[in-house]
Design a protein with these regions (language model features):
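N-terminal small/polar loop signature for handling phosphorylated ligands or for N-terminal nucleophile
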Residues: 50-51, 58-61, 65-126, 262-274
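Internal gly/pro-rich beta-alpha loop/helix module
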Residues: 98-100, 105-196
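Short acidic loop-to-helix transition motifs that present clustered carboxylates
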Residues: 82-87, 139-143, 166, 325-328
């Protein structure tokens, strides 16, 4: 299940509740150490040298507990008591060219600026440019705010214990946290902490989407309509359509502008492709409609934009709006408040829609989601970027845990919009639209992660082929 994003005080309360039930700190530390070692083995090869930096507190204990489980690895454990004295030891080990570092210097309890000796020690670790696994939080980072205390370890991956700490999701923390993963089965009591921000786990989708009924037919799984593609941007329509196919709605009809009709139709066999006319009546037979991918040409008329605005306001159909079409929406309530609405802005688009700057959006992404949803008909908002958010004006907001920087390539967003739309078009999946959207976002990122594990130079076409198959 999704995990609440919590603050440091809540984590301490959770730990105290666990100790009160009879669980021991030593047992939790032992389990954490075992999981740290498992991750470190996965990220290294046999006979690699792993450097472990262990501080005085429980964070250091977690790191030390990993040592006995690092089979077939050479380990250099440095117990760091004084950074000034131990810096020379660090420099000597770094000359041995370790392949990997485990950072257990400071935990979430750090609440003071680091002195110059600690800053120099951490700077030396960072200057080595080695992959670092941070235990619970990168040393030097404020787990409450995401700011650093003068310096912080730049981790490739952070394994946080129990639940993500709110500061780790702040934009300021991203360069230090790296990829954030949660160690959620380490002997702590079940978490009863309430938080509006939830961390998505793969287990959320263990039995989702549900199995198809044995007598299901094309009509059972809906008819997706797509309005996409214009001169110079026809590839976006193709990618969105192919991604929608991976979601397996019963039928897909794509309407596009006449100058790109042949270029698009020649690439799509199972999608019905039509030329755009002056109204949207063609979509009346659809069970959902995607609007926007590749509609960026200068010859998109004001008449078209106005028709889309009215469609957004008045249609009872589920609508997914992406890319250039987001700029055409008016901040307005819909006349059918029960209708499913989804918008998928990246930070730049969100900033334009909210009439604010991109840094302002990124500084408080949760607030941006709430405000976007409120302004645009209580729509579901997929605020893309690192740790994509999914939510509405009220209720929980979910942080996506999958994905990697290689998603930052042209066509990635078109693929996501198409996959979301292909799922939302299916009537059996519309009852829990939020979960359906979250699944699409997670699957999109998980597919990228699986591709990256196999091949570092994959392209969006590879991503489309993987959608629905990531585990």
């Amino acid at each position: 299940m999704s995990i609440p994003v919590i603050n440091v005080g809540q984590m301490r309360d959770w730990e105290r509740a666990t100790w009160a039930k009879g669980q021991t700190e030593d047992e939790v530390i032992r389990r954490v150490g075992k999981k740290i070692a498992r991750h470190a083995r996965r990220l290294t090869r046999a006979d690699d040298l792993i450097l472990i930096l262990a501080g005085k507190g429980h964070n250091g204990d977690d790191a030390r507990a990993a040592v006995e489980h690092l089979d077939n690895r050479r380990v250099e454990l440095l117990d760091i008591n004084s950074p000034e004295v131990d810096l020379q030891r660090l420099e000597l080990v770094l000359r041995l060219k370790p392949a990997f570092v485990i950072d257990g210097l400071f935990g979430i309890g750090l609440n003071r600026p680091l002195d110059e000796n600690w800053k120099k020690f951490i700077a030396t670790v960072n200057a080595a440019k080695l992959p670092v696994l941070a235990v619970d939080v990168p040393s030097g980072l404020n787990a409450e705010t995401g700011e650093h205390f003068g310096a912080a370890i730049e981790a490739a991956v952070t394994l946080t214990v129990g639940a993500p700490k709110v500061g780790m999701l702040a934009q300021a923390a991203w360069p230090f946290v790296g990829r954030l993963e949660v160690l959620d089965d380490v002997g702590l009591e079940p978490c009863h902490i309430q938080s509006e921000l939830k961390w998505t786990q793969p287990e959320d989708f263990q039995s989702y989407p549900p199995q198809r009924p044995v007598a299901g037919h094309k009509g059972t799984f809906g008819h997706l309509g797509i309005l996409a593609g214009s001169l110079g941007y026809h590839g976006a329509a193709v990618l969105a359509s192919r991604a929608a196919q991976r979601a397996q709605p019963g039928l897909i009809s794509l309407t596009t502008h006449e100058p790109v009709f042949h270029a698009i139709a020649s690439q799509l066999q199972a999608v019905m492709v039509h030329v755009w006319t002056s109204d949207l009546k063609r979509f009346d037979a659809s069970s959902a409609v995607l609007i926007g991918p590749g509609l960026a040409a200068l010859d998109i008329t004001e008449q078209t934009k106005g028709a889309i605005r009215r469609f957004w306001r008045d249609s009872e159909l589920p609508l997914i709006v992406d890319a250039s079409a987001l700029d055409w929406l008016a901040a307005q309530k819909t006349t059918v408040p029960q209708a499913i609405r989804v918008i998928t802005p990246h930070p730049g688009e969100a900033a334009r829609m909210l009439n604010m700057t991109v840094p302002a959006v990124q500084a408080d992404r949760l607030r941006a989601v709430r405000e976007l949803s409120s302004r645009f008909g209580n729509s579901w908002v997929v605020l893309k970027g690192h740790q994509t958010l999914v939510g509405r004006s009220t209720g929980d907001i979910f942080v996506n845990s999958s994905g990697n920087p290689h998603l930052a390539q042209g066509g990635s967003g078109d693929a996501l919009a198409g996959f979301i739309a292909g799922l939302v078009a299916q009537p059996p999946l519309q009852a829990d639209a939020g979960r359906t959207i979250r699944y699409a976002v997670w699957q999109h990122g998980a597919a990228a992660d699986e591709l990256q594990a196999k091949c570092s130079n994959w392209v969006v076409e590879d991503l489309v082929d993987m959608l629905g198959n990531a585990r």
